[in-house]
Amino acid sequence: MADKPLTADQAEELHKYVIDGARAFVAIAAFAHVLAYSLTPWLH
């Protein structure tokens, strides 16, 4: 465990990376779902 809590600046930087990662994950997942829907006949 960390001995000291994050500063506000450190927390904001970490939050930015977490949100950017979540956005990238959602974008890739949405793209994969569109591909799966368009390329697989059993989903239509």
Curated annotation (Swiss-Prot):
Organism domain of life: Bacteria
Binding site for a bacteriochlorophyll: 15, 33
Periplasmic face of the membrane: 40-44
Cellular localisation: Cell inner membrane
Gene Ontology CC annotation, any one: plasma membrane light-harvesting complex
SUPFAM superfamilies (UniProt xref): Light-harvesting complex subunits
Membrane topology: Single-pass type II membrane protein
Keyword Protease listed: no
Keywords: Antenna complex, Bacteriochlorophyll, Cell inner membrane, Cell membrane, Chlorophyll, Chromophore, Light-harvesting polypeptide, Magnesium, Membrane, Metal-binding, Transmembrane, Transmembrane helix
Listed transmembrane segments: 17-39
Pfam families: LHC
Cytoplasmic side, ranges: 2-16
InterPro entries attached to this UniProt entry: Antenna_a/b, Antenna_beta_CS, Antenna_beta_dom_sf, LHB-1/5, Light-harvesting_complex
GO biological processes: photosynthesis, light reaction
Molecular-function GO terms, alphabetical: bacteriochlorophyll binding; electron transporter, transferring electrons within the cyclic electron transport pathway of photosynthesis activity; metal ion binding
Function in brief: Antenna complexes are light-harvesting systems, which transfer the excitation energy to the reaction centers.
Protein family according to the UniProt entry: Belongs to the antenna complex beta subunit family.
Subunit structure: The core complex is formed by different alpha and beta chains, binding bacteriochlorophyll molecules, and arranged most probably in tetrameric structures disposed around the reaction center. The non-pigmented gamma chains may constitute additional components.
Listed name of the protein: Light-harvesting protein B-800/820 beta-1 chain
Gene designation per UniProt: puc1B
